[in-house]
Swiss-Prot record:
Protein name: Shikimate kinase 1
Record: residues binding Mg(2+): 18
Its EC number(s): 2.7.1.71
Binding site for ATP: 14-19, 120, 157
Pathways involved: Metabolic intermediate biosynthesis; chorismate biosynthesis; chorismate from D-erythrose 4-phosphate and phosphoenolpyruvate: step 5/7
Subunit structure: Monomer.
One BP term from GO: amino acid biosynthetic process
Species the sequence originates in: Sodalis glossinidius (strain morsitans)
SUPFAM superfamilies reported for this sequence: P-loop containing nucleoside triphosphate hydrolases
Catalysis performed (reactions): shikimate + ATP = 3-phosphoshikimate + ADP + H(+)
Essential cofactor(s): Mg(2+)
Superkingdom per UniProt: Bacteria
Amino acid sequence: MAEKRNIFLVGPMGAGKSTIGRQLAQQLNMEFFDSDQEIERRTGADVGWVFDVEGEDGFRDREEKVINELTEKQGIVLATGGGSVKSRETRNRLSARGVVVYLETTIEKQLARTQRDKKRPLLQVEAPPREVLEALARERNPLYEEIADVTIRTDEQSAKVVANQIINMLESS
């Protein structure tokens, strides 16, 4: 990878976007951003609180603005929120401003990785988590696929292995 292209990670919650993103940025000596963490930094509140107070629409508006600003940077790795792809504007910006890597995982892995995480507002509901994740997958997976330049399944692999796969795919493209 001679020039530093932006790398944008998309996929469902629990796919490993933040963990893999940090690993990838470290290996490539690039700056790492996480859109949820950036929203928390700017608001001084966690994403669950923003979700509760502003609702999903308010949160998505903030997310779209943050992703727009971050994708204007050069040479970054960005882990996006799982629902960021719901915005057509965000999908267009991600596609136009960098390489989009879809980190794919199974519902079982998502359940295992998110079961103790209280910072997942969409899982803090009455419905069983499996049903919530299945509904989100039906809605969002086609959107991830629509903009993905590369798709990698993360289920049984370490962040370092996935980061190396991404680097190898980018170098050969």
